[in-house]
Amino acid sequence: CPGFVNMVRKHYPELNDAVSTTVSPMCGVSRMIKAKDPGAVTVFIGPCLAKKSEVVDQKIEGNADYAMTYSEIRAMMRAKGVALEPVENTYQEASVFGKRFGNSGGVAAAVQECLKESGNDIDIKVCKANGAAECKKALLLMKLGKLPEDFIEGMACDGGCVGGPSSFKDQKLAKKSRDALIKEADDRGIYKNLSNYDEDSFSMHR
């Protein structure tokens, strides 16, 4: 979550070194595309405003070239008279854990699943900071050395990315719709899914 990372940088700079070096899914996908097609221009479209600040952060090489909100792409399509119609789509690319990334707790669940699949029987405690207020509280506890959990999953928007400021649906309705789609996901594991990609061609770290 770029909003969470920005919060750390601005208000808790002493915790900068504790932030994961893993880049965001937006950046990871952009790097993967550019590894295959160096001349590609990548555009992220979603409900997140903080992605715009991440795009202009020159320290993140290979990131998306542009970030647009749903409001912006909707306005562009309306101006051009484009009307989207629902289509049947049975194609799936991400694992169910990847599909849950947009929900609060989704990233933490993926980390725990990775440990499980890799045979690392580690009992880790996760602080799922849902929304800016919980993020601030968790970071303050960490700063004081009083955070009881092992790591923080920080989501600046309530409910996770689905609660972003450019979301057109009510948060509960958006989560309900996403949960319905997630139920249709197959049962492939994370590592099995990652085997479909040439991970040696790009880096997932800052």
Segments and roles (model prediction):
Residues 1-206:
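Iron-sulfur-associated redox domains of electron-transfer enzymes in respiratory
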